Amino acid sequence: MFLIKLELLYHIMSKQQYRSEMGIMGDILDVTQNGGQQGVIVSAISRRANLSHYAVLDKCEKLIKAGLVETKRDDRNRKFRITEKGLDFFQEFKTFQNLLESMNLRY
C-alpha cells in the first residue's frame, strides 16, 4: 500500500515539473513583451523562460508563423519582439490562465 502511494506521489510530482506547450509559449510571449521595441535575443529568452537555446528557436519559429512574434537582425544578433497580434493574444491567454488557476486546473 505504501509503495503504491509513493509511486502515485512521484507520478504527480513529476507531472508538475513540466509545462505545457502553451505555458512555454506564454512564457516566451511574456519575455518578448517585457523586451519592448528593441526586442530580446535568444539567450535572454532562454534564461528568463528557462528553456534551451534550441527550444527557444523552435517555439519562436512557431510564434512567428502565427504572427505573434517577429524577428529582426541588428549588427550582431537576431532579436525577437512581440507583435500587436501577440499582445492581444497574450492578454487573452493571461485571462484564460487566471481562470484555470482559480478553478485549480492546470493548462
Region spans (language model):
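Basic amphipathic alpha-helical segments that dock to polyanions
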Residues: 45, 59-66
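Basic, amphipathic "hinge/linker" alpha-helix immediately C-terminal to the N-terminal HTH DNA-binding motif
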Residues: 76-92
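N-terminal helix-turn-helix DNA-binding core of bacterial DNA-binding proteins
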Residues: 16-55
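A short, conserved structural fragment
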Residues: 64-74
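Amphipathic alpha-helical dimerization/coiled-coil segments
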Residues: 2-14, 91-107
